């Protein structure tokens, strides 16, 4: 199977910078802003966006992670134990503008699961969505507010995001 590099390290850096600016513009600054990255690569992207926002505004935005394991609808988990542990952040997200961050937006099911996790225990003012890659093929009425790159794909193709923090390289590849 052939693979195509869609984004290299420099393209990812530029995209993260642009997305940070878009999030700041959307929120009119950093007030009440919280970033939540969906494990695993979304959490690394959230930290990168947090760093960019800090460089731009000289303010550290509260940033955490969402583990959607117990909220997925495509696997059966014995004795589903839904706890607040799905969200890890050192800040209250009630009455905040929460931006969910993920690497690839595809069917929308991961985002639905993250919404379930957030809304189970909190009530944000507003929830937005940022995705490094939007590949289409939605199964749910979900769209990203901030998109790094729209990449039309077939359902047979895979979009792979590699980030230094996990994969020792930065690239977005289609195979």
Swiss-Prot record:
Transmembrane segment boundaries: none
InterPro entries: PRibTrfase_dom (IPR000836), PRTase-like (IPR029057), PyrR (IPR023050), PyrR_bifunctional (IPR050137)
Binding site for substrate: 40-41, 102-110, 135, 159
Alphabetic keyword roster: Glycosyltransferase, RNA-binding, Transcription, Transcription regulation, Transcription termination, Transferase
Gene3D superfamilies per the UniProt record, alphabetical: 3.40.50.2020
GO molecular function term, any single one: RNA binding
PANTHER family: BIFUNCTIONAL PROTEIN PYRR
The protein's assembly and partners: Homodimer and homohexamer; in equilibrium.
Name of the protein described by the UniProt record: Bifunctional protein PyrR
Organism, scientific name: Staphylococcus haemolyticus (strain JCSC1435)
